[in-house]
């Protein structure tokens, strides 16, 4: 059975006019290596830590600024939100289609809340805590092309023509702000688009981005702003001692107009200085060590890297299944071809390398989890290929071959073909990222040993379900298994209303 909303009734939960207070027993285990009767043994010790959570239930008016607003993702997301807000329907060859938010974790997925008369009860994911309604989001942003959003939507060739015709009046007067352009960081073939750029030194560019964000917030009377990079993949930045390895060196490098500071890092610096969350939706190393230091010092949320939408999401599920089933993946070969501007930009070797790194590391934690299958240092052969084929446009093809060792030296091969409508998969992920980043800024917590409430760590690990290469704080394990990532996010929000993690034991029926 599905219910639209619910309220938790528990001595551990208190609802006030503006807040939800919850007391939560976090049950975990720690492993120690101890001398027991003269021999060292691994000892697993269960422990319980009591946490207090405090969630501000006042939902703000949210502004979202996209870097690369006029690209396929930005124009598709903007069009989709307008279509939902206006209740637009359109004719396809199959039926009359209604606007929806399918593909969004927050808007179109559900969570189990319990049972009623022997029937499982489910509720919308978004009903856990008060979230911003995507229909109410105000969009803005930057692009190195001055094409209006209606023409950008047409150029992208993602949405049906009937829908585009209905959306044009809403979008034809929307023009992105000038963006930061540095041809050294993206493919040369992007130069023809760059007619809408911010001039000046890197310090002047950062100052302009700050000015843009302040004016956007004031003009639209929004309470909060979240910025997300959905522009071209950049090449990797070189991390150099004295340049970008510390907060001080990074800021001094901006002042000196050092060439190795990328545009995405400049946007992120501007956001951190303004106290605005910044999310990187591309695979490059935007978050150099100095930028992470800056975010931690200023306690500003940063998240990334790279939207996890198609092939990589499937890979993080399938490899988790194989390793969890005691099957040993020995070879993973992933081939992609796509024809949109992302594919065109990735045709340059330096930008492809950023994507290759992002896609290749997705199985590492799952392999490391099973010392029965894999010796120390052993790893499956893993190859990623991406080719630009203009004809297929935004309809990316992903073909994967998984070869594994099974019982008694046998071999198993799984071949998968996945047609990924690139921007239609990415757009709802962008929506989830900004909505979850916003709600994260309204949650505070403390352990029983801490005196006062504090926010989550600025490096937003809980967004990892939505990213290929999750950004984590120093010393934190990287988790790529999709089921674990979703469970982490759901269980944190469940804790905010005093609900236990979903353990799927259903002992009441045993």
Curated annotation (Swiss-Prot):
Pfam families per UniProt: Inos-1-P_synth (PF01658), NAD_binding_5 (PF07994)
Catalytic reaction(s) noted: D-glucose 6-phosphate = 1D-myo-inositol 3-phosphate
Subcellular location: Cytoplasm, Cytosol; Nucleus
Record-level GO BP terms: inositol biosynthetic process; phospholipid biosynthetic process
One GO cellular component term noted in the UniProt record for this chain: nucleus
Predominant subcellular localization, coarse grouping: cytoplasm
Keywords, ordered alphabetically: Cytoplasm, Inositol biosynthesis, Isomerase, Lipid biosynthesis, Lipid metabolism, NAD, Nucleus, Phospholipid biosynthesis, Phospholipid metabolism
One GO molecular-function entry: inositol-3-phosphate synthase activity
EC number: 5.5.1.4
Gene3D superfamilies, alphabetized: NAD(P)-binding Rossmann-like Domain (3.40.50.720)
Cofactor(s) needed for function: NAD(+)
Pathway the protein acts in: Polyol metabolism; myo-inositol biosynthesis; myo-inositol from D-glucose 6-phosphate: step 1/2
InterPro entries: Myo-inos-1-P_Synthase (IPR002587), Myo-inos-1-P_Synthase_GAPDH (IPR013021), NAD(P)-bd_dom_sf (IPR036291)
Enzyme class per UniProt: isomerase
Family statement drawn from the similarity comment of this UniProt entry: Belongs to the myo-inositol 1-phosphate synthase family.
Name assigned to this protein: Inositol-3-phosphate synthase
Organism: Brassica napus
Organism phylogeny: Eukaryota, Viridiplantae, Streptophyta, Embryophyta, Tracheophyta
